């Protein structure tokens, strides 16, 4: 309220694939599965195409297509800028680069076009960074390292380690 006419300083963490910690979680609204009590033949057919026999078996892993649509819309708007073509300064997106990052994904060119043209995004690299080498030269998980499913970035310096919050 005291920064009249200015965008609030905000950050969003963006995943390109459904994060491991959310893949098997069901989407909930009002304390129940998002599709509880819904009977719709078209939705059921879509759910079956995605590997679920019932609507209430759907988990976040079944919604990669929707994730792609959201990421696409976000980066199209972010890259286009405001009505005068000026870039948006906020929110600042932090994109998690994980070992399962889809480098050939449909939106990757849009992400990197934005990075080259505007430089909006921060990239949080989790490829190999959560491992260490033991005395036998083997790559093993480093328990002290940030884990992709336990960290949310808050701009350039602050990272929330969810393991410390729980």
Which residues are covered by each model-predicted region?
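Conserved catalytic cores of very large enzyme subunits
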Residues: 1-166
């Amino acid at each position: 309220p005291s920064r009249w006419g200015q965008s609030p300083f905000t950050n969003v963490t963006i995943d390109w694939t459904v994060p491991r910690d959310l893949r098997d979680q069901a989407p909930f609204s009002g304390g129940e599965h998002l599709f509880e009590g819904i009977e719709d033949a078209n939705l059921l057919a879509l759910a079956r195409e995605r590997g679920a026999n019932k609507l209430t078996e759907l988990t976040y892993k079944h919604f990669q297509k929707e994730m792609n649509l959201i990421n696409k819309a976000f980066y199209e708007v972010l890259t286009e800028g405001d009505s005068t073509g000026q870039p948006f300064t906020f929110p600042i997106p932090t994109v998690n680069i994980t070992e399962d990052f889809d480098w050939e994904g449909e939106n990757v060119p849009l992400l990197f076009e934005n990075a080259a043209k505007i430089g909006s995004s921060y990239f949080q690299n989790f490829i190999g960074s959560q491992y260490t080498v033991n005395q036998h030269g083997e790559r093993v998980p480093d328990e002290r390292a940030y884990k992709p499913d336990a960290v949310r970035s808050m701009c350039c310096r602050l990272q929330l380690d969810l393991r410390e919050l729980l």
